[in-house]
């Protein structure tokens, strides 16, 4: 019996309807590279939201950005048990993928980040790490919007490991599920409420969205708050683009 695929993929193609090139011409043209963005939960709505949010980072002759969904993942990663459950499936996915030049783990808990880095010589980016580092380039103190209260302790442990807890103004929860943040009609309204609290009460000068499922709300949230809002998946893919481009320079 065939094993189920590790992931499903959303791939953008720009070559449909074009005239094929001679084989010799193709071999002389270096590949622009490929970045694989992995949603470690199995919610396809989240992956579609990521794919749409990453469209501004796709450009002519640039690396291909492919978003995929981890078939073995839970519907949402909301507990430490959820985090641990996807570590080895992510490692196997990275080891089995010989066509990607960089990987992005699109979950704010950065599940399996170090384990995946051990499994490949290619760069692996975690969105929490990249989102926080990007926020520090925009503000002295940043705030984080979490999906729920129980996520915050996990995020705090990670910030302590990074040595950056003193730069955190505060982290406040939406008290929503991952699925609700990706598709709920009230998500943006609630994010604006929490973002205003981070800005006015806690002194945050930038806000990091603490869940990949929030990706589609970055721009309207930034317009409402009037301070930088960081989508950590966009931040991670931007870093991956730089890594892939410079590796081919």
What spans do the regions from the language model cover?
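Active-site rim beta-loop-alpha module in soluble metabolic enzymes
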Residues: 153-201, 205-210
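Periplasmic-binding protein-like
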Residues: 37-38, 101-107, 203-211
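N-terminal beta1-alpha1 ligand-phosphate binding loop
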Residues: 33-57
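Glycine/small-residue-rich loop that forms an oxyanion/phosphate-binding "nest" at active or ligand-binding sites
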Residues: 87-134, 138, 144
């Amino acid at each position: 019996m065939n094993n189920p695929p590790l992931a499903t993929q959303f791939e953008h193609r720009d070559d449909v309807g074009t005239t094929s090139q001679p084989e010799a011409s193709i071999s002389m043209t270096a590949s622009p590279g490929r970045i694989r963005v992995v949603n470690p939960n199995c919610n396809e709505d989240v992956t579609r939201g990521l794919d749409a949010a990453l469209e501004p980072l796709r450009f002519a002759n640039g690396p291909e950005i492919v978003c995929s969904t981890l078939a073995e993942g839970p519907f949402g990663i909301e507990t430490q048990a959820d985090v641990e459950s996807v570590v080895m499936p992510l490692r196997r996915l990275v080891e089995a993928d010989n066509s990607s030049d960089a990987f992005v783990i699109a979950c704010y808990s950065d599940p399996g980040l170090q384990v995946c880095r051990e499994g490949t010589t290619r760069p692996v980016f975690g969105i929490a790490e990249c989102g926080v580092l990007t926020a520090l380039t925009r503000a002295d103190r940043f705030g984080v919007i979490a999906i729920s209260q129980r996520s915050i302790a996990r995020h705090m442990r990670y910030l302590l490991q990074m040595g950056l807890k003193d730069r955190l103004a505060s982290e406040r929860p939406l008290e929503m599920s991952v699925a609700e943040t990706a598709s709920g009609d009230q998500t943006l309204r609630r994010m604006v409420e929490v973002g205003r609290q981070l800005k006015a009460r806690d002194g945050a000068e930038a806000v990091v969205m603490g869940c990949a499922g929030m990706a589609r709300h970055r721009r309207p949230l930034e317009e409402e708050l009037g301070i930088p809002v960081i989508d950590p998946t966009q931040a991670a893919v931007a870093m991956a683009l730089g890594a892939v481009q410079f590796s081919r320079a």
